[in-house]
UniProtKB/Swiss-Prot annotation:
This is Nuclear hormone receptor family member nhr-100. GO terms for molecular function: nuclear receptor activity; RNA polymerase II cis-regulatory region sequence-specific DNA binding; zinc ion binding. CDD domains: NR_DBD_HNF4A (cd06960). It comes from Caenorhabditis elegans. InterPro entries: C.elegans_NHRs (IPR052499), HNF4-like_DBD (IPR049636), NHR-like_dom_sf (IPR035500), Nucl_hrmn_rcpt_lig-bd (IPR000536), Nuclear_hrmn_rcpt (IPR001723), Znf_hrmn_rcpt (IPR001628), Znf_NHR/GATA (IPR013088).
């Protein structure tokens, strides 16, 4: 008994033979004619001719083993050209045809007459639907990156440790020490984004949420190999650059996920978008979040709703948002950060291509997602201004000697000396107005 496909080669299996003698040997289109020495359709003829004339080079992302068939022949041009040559299309015939055409046009004695092809013009490369999937599957490297990031996201969000309820968070810490051991700033208490009671935020909740978000975000930074590879000085700068934007991206996704019309916090409290409800919130919290909330909802949360953003896109965006090159970093630090940023951008591009219905759809979605990043960066700057106002004028926000928010949010803190905060506290205690340059 003959077993079906027993003698079929790998290339024949991935590129099935045409169903009739008049089919295109490249893609299987039933309307084939002999072009350049092989049976081919007008689309493949035009593709082959342009590729040879213009000396185009293509690159395959899947080891030169893509399926070439009529409906999906545009997926990989490298494999399509390889298939054209494999079935016997002659590149020399294309070159000689072009030579004859140029000579005829120069002489001007003979008018070149080109017969129009019905419907399927050779210059109209492909009639394939535009809504096809552009890629069969993601590369295994991308799958591993995404799987690792989703695992770490879940681990960090569910990381709980025993703590002393009498003193489990403080703002009195040096930045570098807080980065090295974020549990000094806040114990790893249970994260509760979706509280059933959903209380309005208070000044005490504001202080706690600032500290718990700091610990949560630093814990997440530590999951990225690029961050772990940096020296301490680069880590400190990178935290100051990206702590707020990454936090706002996280908050926005949780507000979108739990359909909260305002900012949702890690302890389950919230700050409302509705200004009528804001009247029930303490003035310090309104000063802190009032300016931020409208842009937060309109420009970030609503964009996530329109796109129906998923968690994979969110974690990849967080990594891109975090890894921002800057002239103040060391050269090695910038190299590490730039390489990592490109890695996560490629992973995001490939993931979006996989889940989209075509290149146009994928490009549009990628643009809309990337437009979120400058918005959360602006939200971070808004919070810098709000936090400075509150931390300098509200002892109930700072607590006793709480200078970490000031060091993180101050615009000139990247260049501050180690004793800068001590001097600022002395001025503040003497009630001398402090102006941020």
């Amino acid at each position: 008994m003959n077993i079906p496909f027993n003698s079929v080669s790998k290339i024949q299996w991935r590129n099935p033979s045409p169903v009739s003698d008049t089919s295109c040997l490249v893609c299987g289109d039933p309307h084939g004619k002999r072009h350049y020495g092989a049976m081919s359709c007008n689309g493949c003829k035009g593709f082959f001719r342009r590729s040879i004339w213009e000396k185009r080079t293509y690159k395959c992302s899947f080891n030169n083993e893509c399926i070439i068939e009529f409906k999906y022949r545009n997926r990989c041009r490298a494999c399509r050209l390889k298939r054209c040559l494999h079935v016997g299309m002659d590149a020399n015939a294309v070159r000689s045809e072009r030579t004859r055409k140029i000579k005829t046009e120069i002489d001007g004695d003979v008018k070149l007459e080109i017969k129009e092809e019905p419907a399927d013009s050779e210059d109209a490369d492909d009639e394939c639907p535009l809504d096809i999937k552009p890629d069969i599957a993601m590369a295994w490297q991308t799958k591993e990156i995404i799987a690792h990031m989703l695992y770490e996201e879940d681990r960090v969000l569910n990381w709980e440790e025993p703590y002393n309820k009498l003193r489990y968070y403080t703002m009195d810490s040096e930045v570098l020490q807080a980065i090295k051991d974020p549990s000094q700033v806040c114990a790893r208490t249970k994260i509760n984004w979706n509280s059933h009671s959903r209380p309005l935020i208070t000044i005490e909740a504001l202080r706690f949420n600032w500290c718990r978000t700091f610990t949560l975000t630093i814990d997440w930074f530590e999951t990225l190999p690029e961050y772990r590879a940096l020296i301490d000085d680069d880590k400190e700068l990178l935290v100051k650059f990206s702590l707020m934007p990454v936090g706002w991206l996280w908050y926005a996704y949780k507000s979108y996920e739990y359909r909260c019309d305002g900012i949702v916090f890690v302890d389950g409290s919230w700050f409302p978008r509705d200004k009528t409800i804001q009247q029930q919130v303490c003035p310090t919290c309104v000063l802190y979040y009032g300016r931020i909330t409208e842009s937060f909802m309109a420009d970030v949360v609503n964009s996530m709703k329109e796109l129906e953003m998923d968690e994979t896109e969110m974690v990849l965006l967080k990594a891109i948002c975090h890894l921002q090159p800057d002239y103040r970093l060391t050269r090695r630090g910038n190299d590490v950060i730039s390489t990592g940023r490109e890695k996560y951008k490629r992973a995001l591009c490939e993931y979006i291509r996989m889940k989209s219905n075509g290149f146009m759809d994928a490009s549009f979605r990628l643009c809309k997602l990337m437009q979120i990043l400058p918005v959360v960066d602006i939200l971070g700057k808004y919070e810098d201004e709000s936090a400075l106002l509150v931390s300098l004028g509200e002892t109930e926000f700072n607590g006793s000697g709480g200078g970490l928010p000031y060091d993180i949010h101050a615009s000139d803190s990247h260049f501050a000396r180690k004793n800068r905060r001590k001097s600022d506290n002395q001025y503040h205690q003497q009630h001398v107005p402090l102006h941020i340059q």
